[in-house]
Amino acid sequence: KENERYYGLLHVDAVNGEDPDSAKERVHFPALTPLYPDRQMKLETETKKLSTRIMDLMAPVGYGQRGLIVAPPKAGKTMLLKQMANSISTNHPDAKLIILLVDERPEEVTDIERSVAPDVDVVSSTFDEVPENHIKVSELVLERAMRLVEHKRDVIVLMDSITRLARAYNLVIPPSGRTLSGGIDPA
């Protein structure tokens, strides 16, 4: 109404891109049954891109699987992440792909946004933001992924870097006075 100071919500058009009535009947994430991966996520797109072909042969990735890329600095982890994102959006267009960048340089964020498909969600928290923001953005992405899974969607989250997220959590918690290996406070 025009004379109201604060406008009220009149009707809901969509919930996570779907009909609001279907949202009422969704199964909540904690009630879902975890299963072992039984469908392979094919990453190879072109014969010239060897890294994704090698991943398909040596370390195949399946729906429902968690993985970790461990390599020294400047080894090409981010390049591999971009190739994986492009492969997933090409080979599995029905899956929702979210790229989470924690504590990255703004230039790196722009590079990844420009190098992936437009339907890929790139969510970032750059290095000039406080650690609380890194945690908040990461938890929002996790919640978004869980809501989409509740709507029976396949969701893939690619994250760079879990080390920096762990560091942000470590900076936010109050210190206990004890230190584990790697400078992590066990509080």
Which residue stretches match the model-derived regions?
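Acidic-enriched and Gly/Ser
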Residues: 1-45, 93
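Short beta-strands and strand-coil junctions in structured, solvent-facing domains, enriched
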Residues: 2-3, 18-21, 75, 96, ...
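Non-catalytic alpha-helical coupling and interface elements of nucleotide-dependent molecular machines
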Residues: 15-20, 37, 63-66, 89-93, ...
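Short, functionally important structural connectors and interaction interfaces within domains
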Residues: 24-27, 33, 46-53, 164, ...
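Phosphate-binding glycine-rich loops and their immediate beta-loop-alpha structural context
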Residues: 31-138
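Conserved P-loop NTPase nucleotide-binding/switch module
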Residues: 109, 115-123, 127, 131-142, ...
